[in-house]
């Protein structure tokens, strides 16, 4: 990102739009989480948009509200965190007015504060060294590096212990099909993955074997 791009804290109304509008605006944004261990901040480089009921076959809200996706229907600017594949947590920014399910999955980021803490979290018990580009490259890795867990589901991203700053200028970005989404939702009709070209922290595209279209 150019050094002349400034960051500012948005109002909640910045997230009232659909995830399709909010997703590219989050590229270059900085998400900060301060836990008991200390702060970690990430510059977002890759996201995916998911919309609501009956509109997006790749969305958790496609068939309506459940206990699991309740936060997705909540106040915009909050966190929707969920457990996936029996082992990983993923983090999303809730968009659209409350009652309309819409969210942006955080897929990749660069650590810009708290690098040592992010490295310890990602190394875990193994203590192995993780390349810096891989610390938050992919949604599950991003969550671990940031210290986000299921207990944060529904948390306000615009208030402590979180903080979210948006760039003053929209950076150039690329789009394409979403990663690992099965069925039509993973096809070319839903090019709702957005990323900053040339950023090392952007995860490689992986087509789901059951995606089509």
Swiss-Prot record:
SUPFAM superfamilies: FMT C-terminal domain-like
UniProt keyword Metal-binding, yes or no: no
S-S bonds: none
EC number(s) per entry: 3.2.2.-
Keyword terms: DNA damage, DNA repair, Hydrolase
A Gene Ontology biological process term: base-excision repair
UniProt key word rRNA processing: no
GO molecular function: alkylbase DNA N-glycosylase activity; DNA binding
Top-level EC class: hydrolase
Pfam families, sorted: Pur_DNA_glyco (PF02245)
Family recorded in the similarity comment: Belongs to the DNA glycosylase MPG family.
Protein name per its UniProtKB record: Putative 3-methyladenine DNA glycosylase
Organism per entry: Leifsonia xyli subsp. xyli (strain CTCB07)
């Amino acid at each position: 990102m150019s050094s002349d791009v400034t960051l500012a804290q948005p109002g909640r109304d910045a997230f009232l739009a659909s995830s399709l509008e909010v997703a590219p605006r989050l590229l270059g944004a900085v998400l900060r989480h301060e836990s008991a261990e200390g702060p970690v901040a990430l510059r977002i480089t890759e996201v995916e948009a998911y919309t609501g009921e009956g509109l997006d076959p790749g969305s958790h809200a496609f068939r309506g509200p459940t206990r699991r996706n309740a936060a997705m229907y909540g106040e915009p600017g909050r966190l929707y965190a969920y457990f996936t594949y029996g082992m990983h947590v993923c983090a999303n920014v809730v968009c659209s007015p409350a009652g309309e399910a819409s969210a942006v999955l955080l897929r990749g980021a660069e650590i810009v504060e708290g690098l040592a803490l992010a490295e310890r979290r990602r190394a875990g018990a193994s203590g192995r060294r993780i390349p810096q580009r891989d610390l938050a490259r992919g949604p599950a890795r991003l969550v671990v590096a940031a210290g986000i867990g299921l207990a944060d589901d529904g948390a306000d991203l615009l208030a402590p212990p979180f903080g979210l700053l948006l760039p003053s200028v929209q950076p150039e970005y690329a789009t394409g099909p979403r990663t690992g989404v099965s069925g039509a939702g993973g096809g070319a009709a839903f090019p709702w993955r957005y990323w900053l070209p040339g950023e090392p922290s952007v995860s490689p595209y992986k087509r789901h074997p059951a995606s089509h279209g």
